Swiss-Prot record:
This is UDP-glucuronosyltransferase 1A9. One of its GO terms (biological process) is negative regulation of fatty acid metabolic process. Its main location: endoplasmic reticulum. The keyword Iron does not apply. Pfam families: UDPGT (PF00201). The modification N6-succinyllysine is found at K99. Keywords: Endoplasmic reticulum, Glycoprotein, Glycosyltransferase, Lipid metabolism, Membrane, Signal, Transferase, Transmembrane, Transmembrane helix. One of its GO terms (cellular component) is endoplasmic reticulum. It is a single-pass membrane protein. It catalyses: glucuronate acceptor + UDP-alpha-D-glucuronate = acceptor beta-D-glucuronoside + UDP + H(+); 2-hydroxy-17beta-estradiol + UDP-alpha-D-glucuronate = 2-hydroxy-17beta-estradiol 3-O-(beta-D-glucuronate) + UDP + H(+); 4-hydroxy-17beta-estradiol + UDP-alpha-D-glucuronate = 17beta-estradiol 4-O-(beta-D-glucuronate) + UDP + H(+); 2-hydroxyestrone + UDP-alpha-D-glucuronate = 2-hydroxyestrone 3-O-(beta-D-glucuronate) + UDP + H(+). It is an enzyme of class 2 (transferase).
Length: 530
């Protein structure tokens, strides 16, 4: 765009700024994951769009939330399943969580309810069957891929088109984060997923931690077998998870050391925990009325996340009984069957503005499944928690918050009505919980750059520089025995043994020489006396 005919310097400056903005704008391919994963990724995508970048989102035509109301190009591809199939498999998965808690990598990866993951894994095969879409992506000359790695498809796309990638994740299942980033994770103080251990493990816990690590190496490849077969088929060469993850330019990790335990990190790992926290907005009149009616006691916010829509009747009644025994008004996000014993102080809603409610000064506690979104909103707003984890990283999140004195954890399958009542009264009446969560909130907010701005910066950085090779450790170029210096240890051990052997031989030779000489002297002396 040419700017002519202006004599005033102000319009000229504006024009130059706009021109610079267009010159810096890039072209970004986004390969997201459905469900709650998309909620936070979307905020980064929207900010990138506002900054003038050309964004193309590739998504399956069957999804729950993907691509809605985005002001960018959205490309869809057909899937081998329907929305009814997706809902059915998801309900089976969610229902299984109320039967037994997943406490081992085996039960997580080998569960009979995991068919939903195979549906997600099949997406990439469907994408690459769409030759028209593949040709469009090939000709588009993207600067980078912004992806959620859960179903592997974004990783496959990045490798297929040889594009630098930015991974957006809370964490990576199994050991693929540490392996893909070549990041050390000492088992002596870095607990594995699902165990619910702190970083101060007992000897017994450290043994269990090592066993879990071995189980990951034995079982994870079976869980991802279908995904890797699809990847190998698309890339036309056998690949492993390491092959897919190891080319990541930047890891945007939705965690923060206010929640997680300190551990080794790599220079291309950027921490954006709390990216889902936003400035509180005015509450809808309906919820403002609930709070005003609660009086001096205030309210308790209760949500088990978007994945839990139904609770077994007996458990729902036990929960309702406990809620009825506290003086606070309880706002319970629940779409299941209304418990028959629901008390007058408990209000069921199909949706609630969770972050805005947690930010209200009359909120006394938060009952949560300890998903990362809810935990960070609780930290940001300084609200103590009663945590009822169900699956995935929720057990670990709950353990971390309990260790830091910011809440109480209950086993949702085994807890009684009395357990929940006591936990609620503890976090509401014991000031230490409020003080601890406020301290964590203060630490979390004391940062030079907001998580959203940090995420946007690093995506743009990869787009500008076509990757971040200067942050890639040389460990990727070493064999496993070179990485652990086994060849050096073997060489030095051989040198030490060789020196020791030569020294021993020399000493033995000298000893024999000395003994031999003494023996001859003694014999000569004896012959003279005779």
């Amino acid at each position: 765009m040419a700017c002519t005919g202006w004599t005033s310097p102000l319009p000229l400056c504006v024009c130059l700024l706009l021109t610079c903005g267009f010159a810096e704008a890039g072209k970004l391919l986004v390969v997201p994951m459905d469900g709650s994963h998309w909620f936070t990724m979307r905020s980064v995508v929207e900010k990138l769009i506002l900054r003038g970048h050309e964004v193309v989102v590739v998504m399956p035509e069957v999804s729950w939330q993907l691509g809605r109301s985005l002001n960018c190009t959205v490309k869809t591809y057909s899937t081998s399943y329907t929305l009814e199939d997706l809902d059915r498999e998801f309900k089976a998965f969610a229902h299984a969580q109320w039967k037994a808690q997943v406490r081992s990598i085996y039960s997580l990866l080998m569960g009979s309810y995991n068919d939903i993951f195979d549906l997600f894994f099949s997406n990439c095969r469907s994408l690459f069957k769409d030759k028209k879409l593949v040709e469009y992506l090939k000709e588009s000359s993207f600067d980078a891929v912004f992806l959620d790695p859960f179903d592997n498809c974004g990783l496959i796309v990045a490798k297929y088109f040889s594009l630098p990638s930015v991974v957006f994740a809370r964490g990576i299942l199994c050991h693929y984060l540490e392996e893909g980033a070549q990041c050390p994770a000492p088992l002596s103080y870095v607990p594995r997923i699902l165990l619910g251990f702190s970083d101060a493990m007992t000897f017994k816990e450290r043994v269990r931690n090592h066993i879990m690590h071995l189980e990951e190496h034995l079982l994870c490849h079976r869980f991802f077998k279908n995904a890797l077969e699809i990847a190998s088929e698309i890339l036309q060469t056998p690949v492993t998870e390491y092959d897919l993850y190891s080319h990541t330019s930047i890891w945007l990790l939705r965690t923060d050391f206010v929640l997680d335990y300190p551990k080794p990190v790599m220079p291309n790992m950027i921490f954006i925990g709390g990216i889902n926290c936003h400035q509180g907005k005015p509450l809808p009149m309906e919820f403002e009325a609930y709070i005003n009616a609660s009086g001096e006691h205030g309210i308790v916010v209760f949500s088990l996340g978007s994945m839990v829509s139904e609770i077994p009747e007996k458990k729902a009644m036990a929960i309702a009984d406990a809620l009825g025994k506290i003086p606070q008004t309880v706002l319970w996000r629940y779409t299941g069957t209304r418990p028959s014993n629901l008390a007058n102080n408990t209000i069921l809603v199909k949706w609630l503005p969770q972050n805005d409610l947690l930010g209200h000064p009359m909120t006394r506690a938060f009952i949560t499944h300890a998903g990362s979104h809810g935990v960070y909103e609780s930290i940001c707003n300084g609200v103590p928690m009663v945590m009822m984890p169900l699956f995935g990283d929720q057990m670990d999140n709950a353990k971390r918050m309990e260790t830091k004195g910011a809440g109480v954890t209950l086993n949702v399958l085994e807890m009684t009505s009395e357990d929940l009542e006591n936990a609620l009264k503890a976090v509401i009446n014991d000031k230490s919980y409020k003080e601890n969560i406020m301290r964590l909130s203060s630490l979390h907010k004391d940062r030079p750059v907001e998580p959203l701005d940090l995420a946007v910066f690093w995506v743009e950085f990869v787009m500008r520089h076509k990757g971040a090779p200067h942050l890639r450790p040389a460990a990727h170029d070493l064999t496993w025995y070179q990485y652990h210096s086994l060849d050096v240890i073997g060489f030095l051990l051989a040198v030490v043994l060789t020196v020791a052997f030569i020294t021993f031989k020399c000493c033995a030779y000298g000893y024999r020489k000395c003994l031999g000489k003494k023996g001859r002297v003694k014999k000569a002396h004896k012959s003279k006396t005779h």
